[in-house]
Amino acid sequence: MLSDGLCFNFPSTNMNYCEFVATLPDDTDNPNQHYHDTQYGFPIEDDNELFERLVLEINQAGLSWTLMLKKQRAFQTSFKGFDIDTVAAFDEAEIERLLADAGIVRNRLKINAAIYNARQIKQIRQEYGSFKNWLDTHHPLDKAEWVKLFKKHFKFGGGEIVGEFLMSTGYLPGAHVETCPVYREILACRPKWAEAV
């Protein structure tokens, strides 16, 4: 859930993500620390990685982000490295394979959305050259405008999913509080949201 549209609040706590991660014990196997420190909010250049993040955000709906991070490798394997062309070609046999895979979220609507969205990204690439170029071309938009655009092109394009996807990939601010050391690292990577400030 977004707090004032500026920073992710970790569910069932009153903390933002940075504060939540800071409370984790050093010996934990919780994957949030690594994700917070090395991925969350950092710009992504590769279309397949952008697609992966979108699929994970979609699958997180109604579940915890910690669960998504724990299942990330299984998702990568099951979705063939999130190769957009490969996923776009998935047929009913592939859908049945995914529905039988206990390593991922076995939700037909979410699986169908991933395949549909891969096909949409293929069409976007024909016009813009890449999914990233499409995102860059439409930047800057506010969250409401992004949601409207995503709903026009993708399945599962609601406000929370789109907001988190764009925050986690550097298109919207708010992944980290300004006092978080990772915030400066992200600024050094020149995220798109910083261009609009």
Say what each PLM segment does.
Residues F10-V197:
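HhH-family (HhH-GPD) DNA N-glycosylase catalytic core used in base-excision repair
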